Swiss-Prot record:
PANTHER family: MEDIATOR OF RNA POLYMERASE II TRANSCRIPTION SUBUNIT 10. It is found in: Nucleus. It comes from Xenopus tropicalis (Western clawed frog). The gene is med10. GO terms for cellular component: mediator complex. This is Mediator of RNA polymerase II transcription subunit 10. Belongs to the Mediator complex subunit 10 family. Component of the Mediator complex, a coactivator involved in the regulated transcription of nearly all RNA polymerase II-dependent genes. Mediator functions as a bridge to convey information from gene-specific regulatory proteins to the basal RNA polymerase II transcription machinery. Mediator is recruited to promoters by direct interactions with regulatory proteins and serves as a scaffold for the assembly of a functional preinitiation complex with RNA polymerase II and the general transcription factors. Component of the Mediator complex.
Amino acid sequence: MAEKFDNLEEHLEKFVENIRQLGIIVSDFQPSSQAGLNQKLNFLVTGLQDIDKCRQQLHDITVPLEVFDYIDQGRNPQLYTKECLERALAKNEQVKGKIDTLKKFKSLLIQELSKVFPEDMAKYKAIRGEDHPPS
């Protein structure tokens, strides 16, 4: 799988370099540099075709749109992953707290119901396979 990404990365780097060189030629265009411009434009088209071929190899990869927002804002896309993990961790802690609270509530409820309705709770515990009723 990594070789697919390496291949795409290589093609993208070549494409970006080609665009950089094309920008240099265009910014200081001379009629004598027309042949070089045409060559760079052909390389540009070939580069787009190569990138399109890579796209076919990576058709099953999905990227969250928020990653592109990070890139558009000039932020590191790896920060998106870090922030997602931090949000997931915080949500996990929150849910764990709720679960612990509900377990404590269940324990206290069973304890109090056992005081008020000892026979019914003994039957309940027997059905649930929990503590056996006192003899």
